Amino acid sequence: MSKKEEKTKVRLPRGFVDRTSAQLHALETMIAQIHEVYESYGFEALETPIFEYTDVLGKFLPDSDRPNAGVFSLQDEDEQWMSLRYDLTAPLARYFAENFEILPKPYRSYRSGFVFRNEKPGPGRFRQFMQLDADIVGSSTVAADAEICMMAADSLERLGIQRHDYVIRLSNRKILDGVLELIGLQGDEQAEKRLTILRAIDKFDKFGMEGVRLLLGKGRLDESGDFTKGAGLSQQESEPILSLISVGAETAEATLDNLKNIVGHTIRGLEGIHELEEMQTIFSKNGYQDRIKIDPSVVRGLDYYTGPVFEAELLFDVLNEEGQKVVFGSVGGGGRYDGLVARFRDEAVPATGFSVGVSRLMAALHNLGKCPVKKTVGPVVVLMMDKDPEYVAYYQKMVMQLRHAGIRSELYLGAAGIKAQMKYADRRHAPCVVIQGASERQEGKVQIKDLIEGARLSAEIKDNQTWRESRPAQIMVDENQLVQAVQEILVAHQFL
């Protein structure tokens, strides 16, 4: 006896998910709404490949301990390393540099697509996820940063998120640079330590002031026993940084005054403060002063930011996995990155942009009851009552008539009998089925069964004999009335 062939085990790679039709529709609807806002600001769509040469992407990910610096990579036939993009910003920098001579400057573009990170997966943390970005490349004025912030606010409101439910938090990397200058951490030789400090501050929302203090010092031991090595700063060196992230006040003016007291005597820090003041004037003149808040604790975790940085934060409570109320938190962020395009050119190219975390934003809309869910309805199903080729062609003609009238429909193409076909139509969420056997064909008639109305009536009729005799929600019409009859059923259920 031959050995039974072993079947391949069905499994999904960790960190990846499948998406259903309903999820995809909700996602497409949300993205289309955001695109409308981006288009209204004069941005145009761009698509770049999911693969780029590894050296083009650069090494900017925070998870540097993972293989290949946190990216998925392979070699092509020329033995050049290529990697799946980890964000949409690095590919934009490559595209702009490659098409520098023909693109308008400043260049406004938006992109949406999947990005990939070779990171340890966990709850809510995936290796493939979608981002939605908008950037202005070629503008050095902070008016561009201000416009990006205002556009982020408008995008959230376009999705139905109310003003009291969100805030755009804003700061400037130059202010942090001023603090680091005060404690002697300027210069290329201190770059790695500055990056560790940056990522420690970026954990403020998650770990609080004490957690940041530990990460600035020797390190932090979490509840699971994992130890994260810190920046190794002394208490004296840590204090100016801790003061910086805690000086936020009720008004922008008060916060800016507090910042001047900390870094106002450094050239870099004062430059960052003046940029925030200029942006605040733009917000006030355009009615955004209550939606965009200066918050010095915002730094962003990637090290290519060079100026204003911002995050979109949702302020309402949700239940976490332990059933505790927590603030939903960030659903996107961005900032100025004047050095990224310059990697490819001799001249500096200023740029600023914003990235939406699509999955988190979709979860937020679901919690608010604003997730754009289409009323579930499948296609009208024409049943296969006779499998003779001549009759199959006849059934297909019915389907084509419905499709030409704009009605989503399909011909059942399985091998099952009438009972199983009806069950199939139920599983497809069909609003109705079209039935034509030999007797109906001879009379030039078709039966149409309204499955939605039938389900409702079946709950009211308890007697099987009454059910069979009444044949609820089932009508007989002439063949030439098929389209009209189906349309009337769809209109009655508000599907047309």
Swiss-Prot record:
Gene3D superfamilies: Anticodon-binding domain, Bira Bifunctional Protein, Domain 2. Keywords: Aminoacyl-tRNA synthetase, ATP-binding, Cytoplasm, Ligase, Nucleotide-binding, Protein biosynthesis. One of its GO terms (cellular component) is cytoplasm. Its main location: cytoplasm. SUPFAM superfamilies: Class II aaRS ABD-related, Class II aaRS and biotin synthetases. GO terms for molecular function: ATP binding; histidine-tRNA ligase activity. GO terms for biological process: histidyl-tRNA aminoacylation. Its EC number is 6.1.1.21. It is found in: Cytoplasm. It catalyses: tRNA(His) + L-histidine + ATP = L-histidyl-tRNA(His) + AMP + diphosphate + H(+). InterPro entries: aa-tRNA-synth_II, aa-tRNA-synth_II/BPL/LPL, Anticodon-bd, Anticodon-bd_dom_sf, His-tRNA-ligase, HisRS-like_core, HisRS/HisZ, HisRS_anticodon. CDD domains: HisRS-like_core, HisRS_anticodon. Belongs to the class-II aminoacyl-tRNA synthetase family. PANTHER family: HISTIDINE--TRNA LIGASE, HISTIDYL-TRNA SYNTHETASE. Homodimer. This is Histidine--tRNA ligase. It comes from Bartonella bacilliformis (strain ATCC 35685 / KC583 / Herrer 020/F12,63). The gene is hisS.
